[in-house]
């Protein structure tokens, strides 16, 4: 991957994490392409985009890299948020999470990832690990059976499209929840892989005609919006973590595709103006840490605003983990502060790791 493609994908990652944070603050960065209609599909797409074919013949290297890059930091964060949750419980009398048990610390992360409310966005990390592992073995099998990109695309499309009907035909247990999430996310991983290998350098899908078609399709999709009184999202939303698709069967697939296209289009359009902004490049490099820490930062901002306005912290206990103080006035302040603070937290963490831990492991 050359520097231009690397920087483009880094800015795309920065946009993706901003969409996650803006979604949790209930506003849309991309207008009619609302975050809860595609934000995590975009991250799965990026993972497929970055997948290297060399792993198809080197499973050990793939597993070693994924465990070190995804699961090891995940459980360090799990330990950190265990401590934070216990401290907050001691100070406020509210336990933001599930009971502290061996199962909830080690097993629940692979089921729903909501053992601690403040770190619940990290459910995506363990799901990504499972999805990419399944993707690796499926790709190995498919290439042996029939090494044809259209056949592979049809296969993964069928898998993805069957996920939503399955959620309506079966009881959503911890096991079926993982199956449904994996099925749907596999489609977007392969879509990213397909785009990187067969579309990006061969077809221009960002022409005015493409833009008109995608905007028209999105306008039609809004006719199917059921999110009139949103608890999650701000239109056309679905909640993949809980396999909640409401009354929809296929619309979430289409809104994910249009949202991914819109994100790619925005990055292509603005790349000449954004490529030299170091903060955006840094943000794209620390999306894991932003995902992990943004709810904690919002919680702290809320505590400060409550204190400034003379409101007891007990008011915070009456709401869920996503609640913020006076959202009409403060939403964008939360967004800017959260993105800045979590980005620099991530930068500091990466520098500390490089200085303190990398030399130790390099000697082994």
Locate each region found by the language model.
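Alpha-helical transmembrane segments and their immediate juxtamembrane cytosolic regions
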Residues: 1-364
